[in-house]
Amino acid sequence: MNTELFGACLLLMLPEDIFVVISRFLSPSDICNLILCGKSLRALVDSEKTWLVQCEEVKVLPLLEIVQWRIGISSYKALCRFLVEVVKPLLGIWVQQNPELGNVVYVMPGFLSVVGCRIIPQKVAPSWIQEDRVKWSPVFEIICGFDGSNGFFLHGRDKEGSCLYPGFVMGIEKNCDVLQLEVVPRQEKSSCNEIERGASRKEGEIPFWMLAFSDRKHLLNIVTNHVGLHVVEPLNEMLFPTLKDDEVKLNERRTILLKMHKFGGNWKNMNLEEDGQLSYNPMQVKINEMLENLDDDFFFELHEDLIEVTPTESTYVLRKSSSSKNTTPSQSEIRHSNRKSFLSSGDTFGLGLKASYTEMSYYKGWPDMYVHHFLLYKLPVKKAVDHETYAGLWGGTFGWPAGKCPKGKTEKSLYLLMLTYEKEYSERVLIGTKILEGNRLVSRPNGTTMFVVKIDTPSLEPFPVDADEIHFENSYSGKGVTDGYGFRYLGSKPGSLFVITNDFLAFVWKDTKTMITLHRLNLTEILKKGLGSCVPPSHPMKNFTYMRTSSMNEFTSSSTDLCYSD
């Protein structure tokens, strides 16, 4: 008997419960490989108990929620597929440079879904950390179908109210760090009404990101205007289970979303079990038909003064003809040719979300970002470990005590800081990077390094105010931001980081005695308590990625401003 056959026989001799324990040391791909080894092994391996363990080992949901999610899906195997391929890669904090007060999108598990919620720049009451009251707004969600498939919805609004914009998930890479909103070309099968994704891009076809910025913006406008579905506010707010929501309501909402994704505006009169052979696909737009009787420039030639062609926007299509004439095509020719190539690559066009990996560079924990691209960037969140105790997301306000407001005021500006460890001149430092602030006008741009602390250098400075009842575990020497505006050339002054507990810090500027107090945050727990308020979403493009430089809070003051011109 050969070794492989002998090993298979040993596995078959194991009781199911014993194999389930062993399966904790196997990956989902290992389980799938065993299933392919034969019918006998499949009967042992491909069981609900085994896949339940695999769902646990993904480590994105507690066991209780895994069991609750199973009610709305065909099997734990299908659920594991959704957790591995969609939920785990997307969870975390995603950011953008603009507006400069902060653009933080927190992606977390919903109910048989993964949801993106924007944390709004805001002022908070003294008891905010105890009451967990924060303002947030829906950005997008990906729902899980009965078979483990997925469907994408972008949140937004038009003049009549809140909308959902159904679309496609165009791929999620395991280690993705860039999230892109795009218009995707689709090919119709000649034999039926089904839609299939192209197997590969033909040589010379232009991807969406290579179009001029204004063309991308107009295409997104066209598609969202045609696929948007109006919803009532409660449907727009119940993205995740809270203490106030019950399982019945969440199941009802999910059923509605699945219908909307499948049938579009006709969802109220349809059942999910129906084939739904519609004469059109509710998620797709026949842009080329719209352009048949109109010059395509009717849609695209607006705001020509804003067109910029970057080196990445050069076109393969023009390369041969231009080289033969030994002339360089103009920016207008490149732009027009790229647009024509893109529009010819599909019969219809839909909204797409793609999560991909790029080798990004960082400056003090903040990613270098591309302008004029509808992108969100993942901010690495390090878990607190023994040698990096203070890593992670922190929220706080200026002043002491932490819960006291200045005289005559009832609220203080909320700051979110990401704390990371780096090596600087052979020394280990703790960097506090600002990712959100709640002032009316920005004082420091998004991504500013608020302080740098030498974590191995104790501070001898005393705490500047009377705190007899407070015991400080440690204090470290460092420097905090002062004058200057920007990222790389800010002024700084000496300061100290005081550790009250591992979840409560205070940084003090030595000269001014100015102080910011910080508490460690768990946004999932805060949002699931349901005590915060949901701010209506903005125009769909603006709601995903705000592209204009601004020092104001665009997600509250301009939430009803539906004009999105750059």
Swiss-Prot record:
Source organism superkingdom: Eukaryota
**Taking every annotated instance into account, which residue ranges of this chain make up the domain F-box?**
8-54
Region: Disordered, residue numbers: 318-338
Q: Where is the composition biased (Low complexity)?
A: 320-332
Name the chain's protein.
Probable F-box protein At5g39490
Species in which this protein is naturally found: Arabidopsis thaliana (Mouse-ear cress)
